[in-house]
Every structure is written in structure tokens, then in C-alpha cells.
Amino acid sequence: MKIGETAPDFEAETTQGKVRFHDWIGDSWAILFSHPKDFTPVCTTELGYMAKIKPEFEKRNVKIMGLSVDSTGDHEGWAKDIEETQGHAPNYPIVGDADFKISKLYGMLPADVEGDPKKRTPADNATVRNVYVVGPDKKIKLILVYPMTTGRNFDEVLRVIDSLQLTSKHQVATPVNWKPGQEVIIAGSVSDEEAKRRYPQGWKAPKPYLRIVPQPQ
């Protein structure tokens, strides 16, 4: 799968009931993030933090869905540990992909994987540690793949969503380390003539291809 392709649709059992992914997204943005195995340390911190900052995603009209090859029953049992140690229990649906169907569909596991998921170790599922950001058009906007030893930075995911939502509305790009409210770059596809109409106040241009303007509102 690549950025710009349609996110594969699926129907699955989650901790909040059965869902069809595209219908569940509706007109919102969405994050599908997977983890190698329940009852593991790094994942415990990740799912707890995601629950803590869920309101920030909701402000941006972003829905959250987790996934692993464990059962929904295991997810529910693990949620108690997450709340106890992290202060927040998962407050978003988590897919029970015990038949590996979705992990295979998204290319996180080889097509020939089979067997009892309970017998698989976290190392067996090391490739099931991804983040997908999906737009209202059901297209994949971002793919992040992390190693098992490195917890994900969900604040960075928020920053990227801010950039994606801004640049989907305005013909701009965001520069290195950009944060909301900072200057942006006029997209290269916008001619100087069109830029003058859009930005009558002008822009800074240390080079002709680098046209800097305040963030559009």
C-alpha cells in the first residue's frame, strides 16, 4: 500500500462491536494503529496515552481505531492493566484480528501466516506496529512503521494531521518542524500570478521556489 491509495475496507469485531471500516469513518478522518501483542510494556504505554489525548483528535474530527491479532476478550482484559498503570483505559474500538485477515490485508503480515494467535510471540508480530491516517475520501494520507523497541509519538501524529488538514484546504506546504500557527510555504503548483491573488500582501522569497507566507486561516 502507498500514500494516496484507497485504504482497504474490512468488517471486523472490535471492543465496541462489529464495524465496517469505511462506514465507521463516514465523513471524518481516521487513524488505524496496530500493535504487536496485548499485555506488552511499550504497547501498554501507547494505548494509554492515545486514550488520554483522544479529545485532541476529536477536536480535529479524527476517529481512532486500534488493532492487534489478539481477541477482543484479551483487549478487554488488558484494558484494566492499561487504566491501572497509565491512568486511562482505551476509549476507542480495538479490532480483534485473531484470524490475521486485516493484518494480511494491510501487508503487515505475510499472506501465508496461520495458526493460533495466542502461540505467537510479540517478535512474531513485530511488523504489526503501524499507523495509518485515512482521510474522509478513504485515501491513505500517512503511513508510519515503528520498531518494537520504540514507542510511537502520537503528538507527532497530531502535528501531521494538522498539516494534512491545512494543506487539504489551502495550496500550501508545511516546512520542517512546522507547528500550527507558524509560517507555511506556497505550493509549487501555484504560479506567482495566482499567488498574488491569494496573498495580496505578498510573501518572503529567499529563492524563487521558496515562497513563505503566514498560515492561512
What are these model-derived regions, one by one?
Residues 1-217:
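Chalcogenol-based redox active-site neighborhoods
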